[in-house]
Swiss-Prot record:
Keywords: Endoplasmic reticulum, ER-Golgi transport, Membrane, Protein transport, Receptor, Transmembrane, Transmembrane helix, Transport. It holds the Pfam family ER_lumen_recept. InterPro entries: ER_ret_rcpt. Belongs to the ERD2 family. This is ER lumen protein-retaining receptor erd-2.2.
Amino acid sequence: MNIFRISADMSHLLAIIILLLKIWKSRSCSGISARSQILFALVFTARYLDLFSTYISLYNTTMKITFLAATYATVYLMFFKFRSTYMRESDTFRVELLIVPAAILALLINHDFAPFELLWTFSIYLEAVAILPQLFLLQSTGSAEVITAHYLFALGSYRALYIFNWIYRYYTEDYFDPIVVVAGIVQTVLYADFFYLYVTRVVQTRKGMELPI
């Protein structure tokens, strides 16, 4: 049993649950970037298109279905049920600046040119930067609700824990994938400043988080 991978997946699942509960209970998606959520939906769609053709384990299949369903549910809530609360004017990050480079990188740096492999590689690259619209939105508004901060911390922890998973697999299985490791490090670095602000302004004060603009 790889405790690091399970912990990472549980942290990821916790992040998604926090986000869905935040939106549903408050009846609002204020402070949440729909553009980031669309990118995450694209990430999981590209990564899990092999859902019905490749079976690894019940755990793996269950997590795939859960992440897909939860992400699309979030997008639905933001664009339909609670669309009037979506901060469209502030959520302006140009996602094509992330999607196009990720697609080009997937074509240039990959393990194989098989369709599913290219889609998987694209999803790894895109996931590394998919949080940028959310961080950009926080920077634009200058603050984050406590529950939104908890969501982002859990999401960042998921990727940080996966770094320990890769270290564990390297020493126990002699497994090393430079694509996922480099992308994971980039993603973790993007969260670094947020982690610091989370600890100093949310955990210690138990209040919302004001960001320097």
